[in-house]
UniProtKB/Swiss-Prot annotation:
Protein name per Swiss-Prot or TrEMBL: ATP synthase epsilon chain, chloroplastic
Membrane topology: Peripheral membrane protein
Subcellular location, principal: plastid
Keywords assigned: ATP synthesis, CF(1), Chloroplast, Hydrogen ion transport, Ion transport, Membrane, Plastid, Thylakoid, Transport
Source taxonomy: Eukaryota, Rhodophyta, Bangiophyceae, Galdieriales, Galdieriaceae
UniProt superkingdom: Eukaryota
Disulphide linkage map: none
Function description: Produces ATP from ADP in the presence of a proton gradient across the membrane.
UniProt record similarity statement: Belongs to the ATPase epsilon chain family.
Gene that encodes it: atpE
Amino acid sequence: MGLNIRVIAPDRIVWNAKAEEVILPTSTGQLGILSGHAPLLTALDIGVMRVRITNTWTSIVLFGGFAEVENDEILILVNGAEEASVINLDKANKELIESSSLLNEAKTNKEKFEATQKLRKAKARVQAANTLTNQSIY
């Protein structure tokens, strides 16, 4: 396994393991990283990070942050994160519906921004939880 991946949130180490591949949700789209990748620093968006260890994919929801890639070391600093394995799909779907309603009811720019952020987080949580049932990475 070629990559050492560390995901660190303000309150804990979310992930610290070796893997063969990682797909990151960057601010400009998904970014795949394999062993030998060129050094880079990138902003991360709210979305699902996927990690491949042998033939198994693991999904982790990231709530924005930064990633640094150098010498097969990936350091990911995030505002928050949640592993797909701890997400309750029914609860996540309910939150998706509620956040969509909040967005529709929002009046001020601040309310719209906050509702949009909640909606994006809810969508990412549902997407990650769904990967547990069908193992599709997209």
